[in-house]
Amino acid sequence: AFAGILADADCAAALKACEAADSFNYKAFFAKVGLASKSAEEIKKAFFVIDQDKSGFIEEDELKLFLQNFVAGARALTDAETKAFLKAGDSDGDGAIGVDEFAALVKA
């Protein structure tokens, strides 16, 4: 899904680091997967991969399945992880993460 943007080995390593339930940390994940060091254009491409329904926003149900965008068969985020991730990214309080909010979250 992230061919040409992220290395498979980086995706696998980032997933291994948050295998246990409630161990997901978006800052550590974005750093490990290599997204934090990417250009604004590449981060935008990543956003559109994660925005499964192409609504222009990443909603809670898409966040829950966030890890599966990086490696097929990865675990779903727990409710607590999903809510914390949404809260961190949703700076305008509309219940979803827009592309600019996502970029800010990746670079946080």
Swiss-Prot record:
InterPro entries: EF-hand-dom_pair, EF_Hand_1_Ca_BS, EF_hand_dom, Parvalbumin. Keywords: Acetylation, Allergen, Calcium, Metal-binding, Muscle protein, Repeat. It comes from the Eukaryota. PROSITE patterns: EF_HAND_1, EF_HAND_2. The keyword Acetylation applies. Residues 38-73, 77-108 form the EF-hand domain. One of its GO terms (molecular function) is calcium ion binding. Ca(2+) 2 binds at D90, D92, D94, A96, E101. Disulfide bonds: none annotated. Ca(2+) 1 binds at D51, D53, S55, F57, E59, E62. SMART domains: EFh (SM00054). GO terms for cellular component: cytoplasm. It holds the Pfam family EF-hand_7. The modification N-acetylalanine is found at A1. Belongs to the parvalbumin family. Is regarded as an important allergen. In muscle, parvalbumin is thought to be involved in relaxation after contraction. It binds two calcium ions. This is Parvalbumin beta 2. It comes from Macruronus magellanicus (Patagonian grenadier).
